[in-house]
């Protein structure tokens, strides 16, 4: 899979809002995350080739624990077929990577993200109270959140699938991550994220909530998730996060 800029689930404008409106602790967590995001976006080092599986459709997962550091991938804590180690973030990452892989294989006969059998790797407990999750072109990375604004980033299958779907877009469309091209990139990931959640829940489109990030907002935050695809602009309205700014129609965007 080619080198790519990291794709983050929490955009910089939300982090800046927390820096402006949050408590001192919330501001610190958001600023640390924002600084990290800006650093990674400014410098994308080359990466070694990711491992692949030779049998079409065969699922292979590796889950690592970053130990609240920013060293990737971390310590391996679960591999394909290994039982749970009791860490909920590890189990969620393992399960949701698997469900996303199954969705693309069973629905589209797509052999992992790149259609060449890419092994799925995820690292949990990244950074200290890190308020984001991202796909770095080779693997998934999940922060734990701060527990005040965001819960752990493995909690929402649509977020996991959203980020993994950037790997599909990278290998197929090559959409430049800028302005409308970048918006299309994000939109495709939102669609696939919601479809994977529907696949997991065995829902039809009319029964789905079309919320991206269900469960991600911590208790006390006024919102259902990060975005609503059925009612854009209504996902959250909170004193710290502000109001969901997503337009419902193109005329509201231009």
Range-by-range predicted roles:
Residues 1-158, 167-254:
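Zymogen propeptides/activation segments of proteases
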